[in-house]
Amino acid sequence: MTIYNFSAGPAVLPKEVLKKAQAEFLDYAQSGMSVMELSHRSKEFDDIIKEAESLLRELMDIPDNYRVLFLQGGASTQFSMIPLNLAQGGKAYYLVAGSWGKKAYTEAVKLSKFIPFEPILLASSEDLNYTEIPSFDEKEIDPQAAYVHLTTNNTIEGTAIYDLPATNGVPIVADMSSNILAAQYRVEDFGLIYAGAQKNIGPAGVTVVIIREDLLDDEPVLSSMLDYRIQADNGSLYNTPPTFAIYMAKLVFEWVKELGGVAEMEKRNREKSGLLYDFIEQSDFYRSPVRYKEQRSVANIPFVSPSPELDAKFNKEATAAGFKNIKGHRSVGGMRASLYNAFPLQGVKDLIAFMQKFEKENS
């Protein structure tokens, strides 16, 4: 039985990457050591991290005036690092279009009790259960504000921002965890991009931060580990970094490049997601909660059947049939197909065949 992993993260990795990691696992580059054993100060690892950065710069066309960091703590740590480094003494706006955006805003509010800055809720679609991206008037934004924070892809709710909103000249800070390298964006349209690795970059353990140099603060931050300037000045080696996760990210970057880059990834992702969306649309049994087609995620596709009881039955039977981790997030229920870069087209076709069978048997 073929197993398809629909997990929202940690997620499916390219088989080619796993095989290469397996082949190099015991003896990396004739060093006589595993990658997991390499000193982060060794030439071997220095080559790995520099090549990882070079590949990411090429794939995303990152300008020279941006720094690339490989950090620890997951994207959630960035919820604190961003205001600590960028917002002290100023205003920070938050566009909340999903659960993760709300967590970022909530963390900022908590932090504002201890450092001098003002987090402002720019707009939220929570009252609509995050079924759409909320709109706002850019004139509401103070042009002197530190940043506008948004999430480019909402993994739980299945919405995405492809065309960035106008922000009255204020830098955009984006959580791009679930569609980095899966959809094309211009890096220069952002002040800062951050992304946890465990969806399109590699295994959990490393977080990529891409920050414009003029946003690196010379003022001391609460903690050296949480200071972008210190991390940048030390080439992400201020302390021992997640070496194996960075190595795996490098292999994934190589894989994306070999397949044709981010443009090819987006083309494939739109084909995969398009098949599933088209099937759901023509079905009287399944429904997508996302209100507007242009806001549909190509990475995470939530859907429901006519009842929670049928959802539970679907999840049980789908799991038994090899469609793993397809259950929707506990906060929304239903089902969710996460179709990240490494997820195969055949997996979508097989899922649709299963959905057709389930619909026929339960209508």
From Swiss-Prot:
Subcellular location(s) per record: Cytoplasm
Any one Gene Ontology BP term: L-serine biosynthetic process
Coiled-coil residues: none
Cofactor note text: Binds 1 pyridoxal phosphate per subunit.
Keyword annotations of the record: Amino-acid biosynthesis, Aminotransferase, Cytoplasm, Pyridoxal phosphate, Serine biosynthesis, Transferase
Positions with a binding annotation for L-glutamate: R41
Single GO cellular component term: cytoplasm
Modified residues (N6-(pyridoxal phosphate)lysine): K199
One Gene Ontology MF term: O-phospho-L-serine:2-oxoglutarate aminotransferase activity
Classification via Pfam families: Aminotran_5 (PF00266)
Reactions accelerated catalytically: O-phospho-L-serine + 2-oxoglutarate = 3-phosphooxypyruvate + L-glutamate; 4-(phosphooxy)-L-threonine + 2-oxoglutarate = (R)-3-hydroxy-2-oxo-4-phosphooxybutanoate + L-glutamate
Amino-acid positions noted as binding pyridoxal 5'-phosphate in the UniProt annotation, renumbered to this chain: A75, S76, W100, T155, D175, Q198, N239, T240
Pathway: Amino-acid biosynthesis; L-serine biosynthesis; L-serine from 3-phospho-D-glycerate: step 2/3
Cofactor(s) needed by this chain: pyridoxal 5'-phosphate
Catalytic activity, EC: 2.6.1.52
Entry superkingdom: Bacteria
First-level EC class: transferase
Keyword Magnesium in record: no
Subunit structure as annotated in this protein's UniProt entry: Homodimer.
Biological role: Catalyzes the reversible conversion of 3-phosphohydroxypyruvate to phosphoserine and of 3-hydroxy-2-oxo-4-phosphonooxybutanoate to phosphohydroxythreonine.
Family: Belongs to the class-V pyridoxal-phosphate-dependent aminotransferase family. SerC subfamily.
Protein name, per record: Phosphoserine aminotransferase
Organism the protein comes from: Streptococcus sanguinis (strain SK36)
